[in-house]
Amino acid sequence: MTTSSFDNGTGNRNEPTLATDQTQPAQPLQSSHDTPAPRAAEASVSDASTPTPGGGRVPSWVRAVVRVIGSRDYVGVLIAIVALALVIGIAHPAFLRFSQLTDVLNQATFVAILACGMAMLLAMRELDLSVGSIYALTSVCAAILMKHGMNSWVAALIGIGVGAALGLTNGLIVQLFRLPSIVATLATLSIFRGLAYAISNGQQLLGPSLSDSFSVFAGGHFLGIPNTVYVMVALVAVLTGVLYYTPFGYRIRSIGSNPEAAAFSGIPVVRIRLLAFVLMGTLGGLGGVLSLGYFGAGDPNLGIGYELLAVAAAVIGGTSLMGGKATIVGAALGSILLAVVAAGLAYFSVPINWNSFATGAVILLAVILDSLLRRRRTNNSPRL
């Protein structure tokens, strides 16, 4: 879909689309002079439950929650979300209703899933511009399988597997031919989108019926909140743990900080790079099959521009384009900011021709605010 749409309380399932791209300043390089990288990673994981002065141990998940909540990397985007929501709510009080706020969260979910994977790639100085096409192709593939009588859950799992295979394809192209990922995935963007059009004949394909259990799950609610939001929250929690509390996440950040030093220290750079692309493709597949269950159709036009949305959300949330740093929570918050912008444009009846301009301007302001706040913290931090 090439135009932005937002549900103003009608209950219709509409797909949001915005597009932008931003940049962030480079982050300081990480260093590991005394401990080889793999051992340092293992140490960071094993230290997650260190003894406290009282003799007890702090569970690793508690330390993870404290670390995420205590982080200030994404305070700028959080302030922007609250400020924009208040501005819209003052002018249009209906926006602050619980049903509308949960709808904004749901609108953000599909981009947030992609943005989480994009943050992992950006952390190691890579990029996947084909993720929007993967999103569409996997939804079409799953819809075809369901159309031929396959169980919807099995078809959804196969669709996610297709996404993983497409991500692996991207990684192999980048690695085997030594191509910059932006060039390789720019090509596969067109290839995967073309496949989606070819196998669907350019038409929407009906997915599971509304009574199907997969459709009920993808389009259902629990405690008034869409199930897709719970999926996004769970994904953010898992990937945050992976990024900060596993050797895999440590190696991603190490490669992004200094690829040569990472390779010299024994990190399997090629394997980690391939796994990161597979993860990105898997998340593209997850988003695609969830959209199939939610919207009720596989559409080759789905996800157009989502690659730029995912990059923008990740960067707005605090992930560095220069590598070495990523925040999964920030990527999700960046997606929510984009959804709030889309809602504001709809509520203020901004002409469609001005949507891209207004969206880009708001995103730029959010990035500048976030950058200024982080620069101020850096200047105020003690020098060693």
State where each predicted segment sits.
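Helix-loop-helix "hairpin" substructures at the membrane interface of multi-pass membrane proteins
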Residues: 151-159, 164-170, 174, 221-299
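Transmembrane helix-bundle core of multi-pass membrane transporters
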Residues: 181-246, 272-275, 294-303, 379-384
